[in-house]
Amino acid sequence: LPAFRPAAEVAAFGWLRKEAAGGEVVLAAYQTSNALPAWTPVRVVAGHGPETPGLAELTPRVEGFFDVLTTAEARLALLKAEQVDYLFYGPAERTLGGWDPTSWECLRPAYASGAYAIYSTCMGSDA
């Protein structure tokens, strides 16, 4: 990971730090998830290697979530299994398959700025 984070990404992390309750779960690409808990009180599905039980099994599921060919049912199954409250969507997530989260009914826009968006999920505590 780079020694710095893009300003727009840091701003998105800041939004989560203010809005997410401690312990809420965020789904994001590994690259994002590895940094996110250092900036916010959230948990991530697959992040810092030694602190993610089952990382080898979770990584392909997380990557597949963002693949355009993945079904809505498979996405929903991951959200349920991991009790995901928020989806983080930025450049790292876009590289995983080109899926566009804006049209999925299980997501509600919560934050958007530049190349970064955060969605609350239909699994979230306020759903």
Describe each model-derived feature in a short phrase.
Residues 1-127:
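Extracytoplasmic
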